[in-house]
Structure formats: structure tokens, C-alpha cells
């Protein structure tokens, strides 16, 4: 298990005027449209003014430099990392602002495109997207398919309806109905727990998988699901935005790095993106952006890496 990260407390997401409220969080995934911006009204703090760095820009592969724009696939249903602003079109979030800053360092523009989470890695692999930015946990399975550039650490958090009416115990959720977003690291987590239930002679967990996290959250709010699990900042953002309708269960666990997804043959681009992340970490832009989202004390890293050794990090108890 990874080293602990300080946890969110209620109210930490209120630094920006969260005008979208619960309605923005619970937008149906079918309403997700393309967006081309990372700024956006009322969320996060003031976007830092990031200037191009000539040395970093020189690392960008020539074909990308000639294009001048990185096409980035993201699932815009995963607040506060990536989600739609109140206009229903512009994609905002801390993931978006961080990568926009990286692109600015590399003297590149970004074209953000909404996509279903489970299609983004394939989209990068096929060349549809240059990069995938969508709170992707770096794991061995993904590293076998693509390059990944680390930029943030986060674990899994359980949450349920206020007062826990279904009496859900994350360590023994046998027979409960649990909501998760499809294709996330939470799916094998809950599947393993369900298998253990059956081995122990207990009823299996009913696992409800949804294309978007907003839909999974709504199923808990509506009472269709007893509880859910998601990446920690997403779970606490849902709790914040739904007022008194949700609450956390226990603490986060198994913290691991998020990574930007780059084609397996695009080593130069991956290295350039890593250098961009490292630059914003070193000059304080990284912390400034995360602070604007109430995340300055959660999951920050000091060193971005291309394809970090996950097994070694687990053994060392780090990240």
C-alpha cells in the first residue's frame, strides 16, 4: 500500500466559486460535447500566465511542432479533474489546467475533445488523440500499451448516501449494490472484493458500472446504489457538490500516480511532456494551479517521470 496522503476536508473545494453546483457534477455523459479550452468561469483559481520555454519547446518532435496543436482526449464527467463548465461545452478541471500549462511551456496549443473513458487509451493508440488526460492511474496493464507521464498521486475513496442508510462496510460489502465508473482501477478492486465474498459463503456484491462518474454518483444520490468508490478527489468533490446528500466511508487507500497517456512509439513527445510537467513543478505553477482547486496539500509530486516503476514504488511504500 502506498504512503498516506493528507485527506480532503469538507469545504476545501470552495476556493473557486463552484457555480456549476451539483447540476454540473451530475450532467449526463450523453450531454458531453467537445471543448477547446482549459480556462472557464468560476472554477479553480486564477490561471497562471505561463510563457513558452525555448529549451523545452525544442524537445517537441518536429511533426508535432509543425502541427502546433496537441489533440487531447478526456472524459469530461470526472469533476474536479475534467468536467464541463456551466456552458455545457468548455472542458475545465485541475487536470486540464495542469496540461494547458505544460503545453504552454512547450509552445503548443491544446484541442480538448470529450470521449468515453474506456475509449481514450485506444484513441491514443490509434492516433486519434496525441495525448490522453483523464485521471488515468498508472498501472502495469496500461504501461504495456502506452507511455505514461506521472503528474499527481491519488488513492481510492468509498462514499455513500448521508447517514449510510444501507450500512455499508467497505471491508465487507457483500450483498450490497456498489456503483463504479467502467474501465477504472476501481472495477478490479470491487470485483476482487465480490469474489472474496463468494469464497466466504456470502452473497456477491452487485456491481453497477457506468460510463461516466456523474452517472455513478447519481445512482447513489437516487438510492439505486448503496455506495460507490472513486478516485479520492472525485469522491470528495461529489460530496461537496451534492450538499448533505453524500458522505465519505473511511479513508482513501492504495494511492498511485496519475499519468498522461502518450503513444508507445512517441517517446520524444512523452519526454517533452515530462519536461513540461517538471518545469511547472519546479517554478511553482503546478502548486498554484492545484491550490486553486483546494488540492495544494493533497497528492503533489516533486518529480514527474515517464513510465515510472510502479512495482518499485509499491515496495518502497512511496507514491
Can you name each region flagged by the protein language model?
Residues 118, 136-143, 191-192, 221-254:
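A ligand-binding cleft/hinge motif common to bilobed small-molecule-binding domains
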Residues 44-134, 292:
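Extracytoplasmic small-molecule ligand-binding "clamshell" domains
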Residues 109-172:
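Acidic, polar ligand-binding/catalytic clefts
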Residues 27-31:
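C-terminal motif of bacterial Sec signal peptides marking the signal peptidase cleavage site
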Residues 111-122, 166, 205-218, 254-256:
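Short helix-initiation/N-cap motifs at beta->coil->alpha
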Residues 76, 153-160, 236, 240-278, ...:
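Periplasmic-binding protein-like
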Residues 79, 91-104, 136-137, 154-212, ...:
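Bilobed "Venus flytrap"/periplasmic-binding protein-like clamshell domains
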Residues 33, 46-50, 96-99, 104, ...:
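Extended ligand-binding regions for polar small-molecule ligands
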Amino acid at each position: 500500500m502506498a504512503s498516506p496522503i493528507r485527506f480532503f476536508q469538507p469545504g476545501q473545494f470552495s476556493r473557486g466559486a463552484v457555480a456549476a453546483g451539483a447540476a454540473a457534477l451530475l450532467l449526463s455523459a450523453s450531454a458531453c460535447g467537445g471543448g477547446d479550452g482549459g480556462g472557464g468561469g468560476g472554477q479553480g483559481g486564477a490561471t497562471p500566465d505561463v510563457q513558452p520555454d525555448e529549451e523545452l519547446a525544442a524537445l517537441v518532435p518536429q511533426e508535432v511542432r509543425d502541427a502546433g496543436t496537441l489533440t487531447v482526449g478526456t472524459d469530461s464527467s470526472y469533476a474536479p479533474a475534467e468536467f464541463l463548465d456551466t456552458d455545457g461545452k468548455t472542458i475545465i478541471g485541475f487536470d486540464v489546467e495542469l496540461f494547458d500549462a505544460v503545453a504552454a511551456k512547450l509552445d503548443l496549443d491544446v484541442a480538448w475533445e470529450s470521449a468515453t473513458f474506456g475509449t481514450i487509451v485506444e484513441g491514443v493508440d490509434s492516433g486519434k488523440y496525441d495525448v490522453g488526460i483523464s485521471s488515468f492511474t498508472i498501472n502495469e496493464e496500461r504501461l504495456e500499451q502506452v507511455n505514461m507521464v506521472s503528474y499527481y498521486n491519488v488513492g481510492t475513496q468509498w462514499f455513500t448516501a448521508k447517514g449510510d442508510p444501507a450500512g455499508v462496510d467497505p471491508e465487507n460489502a457483500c450483498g450490497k449494490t456498489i456503483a463504479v465508473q467502467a474501465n477504472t482501477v476501481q472495477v478490479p478492486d470491487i470485483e476482487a472484493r465480490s469474489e472474496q465474498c463468494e469464497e466466504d459463503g456470502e452473497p456477491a456484491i452487485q456491481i453497477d458500472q457506468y460510463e461516466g462518474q456523474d452517472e455513478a454518483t447519481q445512482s447513489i444520490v437516487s438510492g439505486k446504489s448503496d455506495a460507490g468508490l472513486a478516485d479520492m478527489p472525485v469522491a470528495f468533490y461529489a460530496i461537496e457538490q451534492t450538499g448533505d446528500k453524500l458522505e465519505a466511508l473511511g479513508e482513501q487507500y492504495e494511492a498511485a500516480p496519475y499519468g498522461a497517456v502518450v503513444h508507445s512509439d512517441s517517446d520524444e513527445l512523452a519526454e517533452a511532456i515530462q519536461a513540461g510537467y517538471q518545469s511547472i513543478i519546479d517554478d511553482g505553477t503546478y502548486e498554484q494551479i492545484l491550490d486553486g482547486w483546494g488540492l495544494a496539500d493533497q497528492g503533489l509530486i516533486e518529480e514527474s517521470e515517464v513510465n515510472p516503476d510502479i512495482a518499485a514504488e509499491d515496495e518502497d511504500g512511496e507514491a
